[in-house]
């Protein structure tokens, strides 16, 4: 189940809307979700499909000359733990290396706050990301922001 690059901006938006609308446990703030969706039009994005339909996607955003952020990622719940997320991260890492980035970062809610996000944290750790820093009030006090980083140097 390889992930593929999505070149058409309208298709990126369509995929983001389709996936995120089905993941309210992670994307339950409408304004924030809409921002992820509209930003997808301007970001490098990857998709995994099953039977011709998108089941997961990931978008990247440059945050510095050497760093790219995994800006948003979603995989439909029935497809969790089936390799789709790993395929998306692998494709994003390959793209980031090819593009010349040295680091990838991702933000999520700190481990220990919500079970859904604990699974997300464990996934990023399993992909090789390392804990970098926690910003307790970046989003709000109920959602402390954990930043993970991944070195893209081999």
Q: What are the residue ranges of the model-derived segments?
A:
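Conserved beta-strand in the GNAT
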Residues: 47, 53-61, 67-74
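Conserved acetyl-CoA pyrophosphate-binding loop and the N-cap/start of the following alpha-helix
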Residues: 79, 83-91
């Amino acid at each position: 189940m390889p992930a593929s690059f999505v070149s058409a901006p309208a298709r990126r938006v369509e995929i983001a809307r389709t996936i995120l609308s089905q993941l309210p446990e992670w994307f339950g703030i409408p304004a924030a979700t809409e921002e992820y969706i509209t930003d997808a039009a301007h970001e490098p994005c990857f998709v995994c499909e099953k039977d011709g339909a998108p089941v997961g996607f990931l978008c990247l955003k440059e945050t510095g000359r050497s760093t790219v952020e995994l800006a948003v990622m979603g995989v439909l719940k029935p497809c969790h733990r089936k390799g789709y997320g790993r395929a998306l991260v692998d494709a994003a890492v390959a793209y980031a290396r090819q593009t010349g980035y040295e680091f990838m970062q991702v933000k999520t809610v700190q481990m220990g706050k919500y079970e859904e996000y604990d699974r997300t944290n464990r996934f990023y750790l399993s992909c090789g990301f390392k804990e970098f820093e926690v910003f307790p009030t970046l989003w709000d006090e109920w959602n402390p922001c954990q930043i993970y980083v991944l070195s893209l140097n081999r």
